[in-house]
Amino acid sequence: MNKNTFAKHPPMGWNSYDYYDTTVNEAQVRKNAEYMAEHLKEYGWEYIVVDIQWYAHGAGSQRDRFQYIPFSGLETDEFSRLQPDPERFPTSVGGKGFA
């Protein structure tokens, strides 16, 4: 393996936390993903990361007290996998996950 050709560039993508913190919703993720696909994909941008508390009900709603809501409500599937907050990610309802 040639050390100069192993990684031509770092992983490139968009992370929801960088702008939206814990408050990101489905419409915002979709808009950013669409923009990235249309304008940045040809330059190697390929990852969309929906970060911290995408699963938490009311995330970001108590900014004056804390950044993260401790012990917020969660939804899990039959295998105990976290499910997206259905209020912020409406297409996830019914166990569809991120659509």
Regions found by a protein language model. Name each.
Residues 32, 36-99:
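Aromatic-lined carbohydrate-binding/catalytic grooves of carbohydrate-active enzymes
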Residues 21-28, 90-94:
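Extracytoplasmic/periplasmic, Sec-exported soluble proteins
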Residues 1-26:
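Mature N-terminal, pre-catalytic/accessory segment of carbohydrate-active enzymes
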